[in-house]
Amino acid sequence: MGWTASLDMGSEKMVMALASGEGSVCHLKGIKIMASQGIEHGVIKDKEKVRMCIRSLMSELMKDREIEVMNVALSGAVLRIVERRIVVPIQKKVVEQSDLFRAEQRCIDAYGGGQDEVVDILPVGYAIDRGEMIADPLDRSGRNLEVTYQVYLADYDYLADIQGLFEGSGIQEIEFYPAVRAYAEALDVERAERDFALVDLGAMGVNVVLFRDGMLEYEAHLPIGVRTIDTDTMAAFALSFG
C-alpha cells in the first residue's frame, strides 16, 4: 500500500491531506490545516517560513509513514496559461486512444526547453478534418484529428525552489498540478450530466471555471479575494458607526 499526500499553499491557510492507495482506489486518511506564512498572493516570498509550515504539517500528519508522492497545487499567480492547437493524422481511419496520446505528447514536446516547464495540459475541444468542435472524438472516422489544449506553464526555477522545500523528507516524487485539474477530478466532470460553473473563493483571489459537455470551457482568475471583501466591509462599518 502506497501513501500519497497533497498540499495546497494558500495566502492564509495551508492544507495537507494524506491518502492510501491500492491500484486506482484512494482512501483519505487525514487532513491538517494551519495558518500560512511566507506566502503572498499565492506566491512564495519567504522559503524558510514556508518550509517550516510544511515540516509542521508533515510531522503531525505523516508521522513514520513513507510518502511516495506529494501533489502540490499551484496558484494561478504562478501559472502562465496558453492555448495550443495540435493536428495529428488518424492512424486507423477511426480515432483511437493512441491518437489522443500522440496529440498530447506532441503538445508537451512543443514546449521543450526554455525557462518554462509544462505543469499540465487539458483538452478543451476536438475536431475531425477541420469540422465543428466536438467533446468526444473516439470512434469518429476521418483523416486528421485536431485537439485544442489549454497548457499550464510555470517557471522552471520556481518549481525547483518548491522541490527544494522537501529536501531530506524522503518523499520519492513531487508532482505539480493547477487547481482546475483538482476541480475536474474531484467533481468527476466527465460523468457530469449537466454543464456547471464553479466559483472558488480564495483569500487573495477568486477562480471561476465553467465546464461544458464534460470538458473545460472557460477559466478566469479575479485578483480580488475574500480578504479584500472583509477589509472593505470592516472599513464601511467603521465609517458608518465609528
Outline where the language-model segments fall.
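Nucleotide/phosphate-binding catalytic cleft detector across ATP-hydrolyzing
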Residues: 1-13, 17-196, 215-217, 240
